[in-house]
Amino acid sequence: VLSLFLFLFPESKVSASVNNKTQNLGEKTIEFSELSEEQQTYFLYEGFDENNQYFQQTIIQQPATEGTLQQRVQANVLFITGSTKKITSTSAYTSYVINSSNAPILRTDTRVTLNGYKSFSSSVIPYNSPYVSSGGIYSSYTGAEKYFSVSLASQITTTMGPGAANCRAGGVTLGN
């Protein structure tokens, strides 16, 4: 499965370790035009545009070793895509889209971290187990003005089990 993925997406760089269930194919910065039509529509609705930075990570969930033949031979590819924008001098909004290629999403536990300061979390149980889940998390900082790099981490549970995805989500200057 990994060989096929790398053949189809040769620009991908395998940059992380493999555990017993998932494989991290790394993070990349992408342009607005590289987002799927569905992702573009969502980010535009959230107030983002082609001037924002977008970051994406790819995770492969390995096929099950038990269950039906289809469950045993089909891998699942998870994508998490995120971006952050400043709302006020003390608050920011990070929007994200999670895509699952072959397994419905049962739950997402997502955390946005203003690096070196604080994390903000959200848990979602998507209605009707969709293959796409999206959301956003507000963050705030009221100290002296400071630049924060923003990171996005999500524990994504699908019908194939859990997968963890982490990526940058931009940066923002906050404070008074």
Regions found by a protein language model. Give the residues of each.
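Mature secreted bioactive peptide module from preproproteins
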Residues: 63-176
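N-terminal prepro-regions of secreted/extracellular proteins
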Residues: 1-87
